[in-house]
Amino acid sequence: MKRICSIYKSPRKNEMYLYVLKADALTRVPEGLLGIFGPPAHAFDLVLSPERQLAREDIATVLENLDKQGYHLQMPPPEEDYIQHLPDELLCRNDPV
């Protein structure tokens, strides 16, 4: 079943997103979560269906959370995903001899 979803970006946490059903807007999101999330900034709307793939979230989990609790919170990736690992030869290239 297809769902029209609004996706909001957190101003406090980089890469944290809140998925809600467009018809419900933010009415089903707990106040405590909104307090931690910060004032939601609308990013975009999206049609979700079981066939659709999302970049970092499992579509079945997102749809289930939207049906059961009215929202889905996408957490930022773990910090090690941000770190680019460089070879040792590049790390010590400018070291004094």
UniProtKB/Swiss-Prot annotation:
- YcgL domain mapped to chain residues: 3-87
Q: Which SUPFAM superfamilies match?
A: YcgL-like (SSF160191)
Residue ranges of coiled coil:
none
Q: Which InterPro entries match?
A: YcgL-like_sf, YcgL_dom
Name under which the protein is recorded: YcgL domain-containing protein Pmen_1774
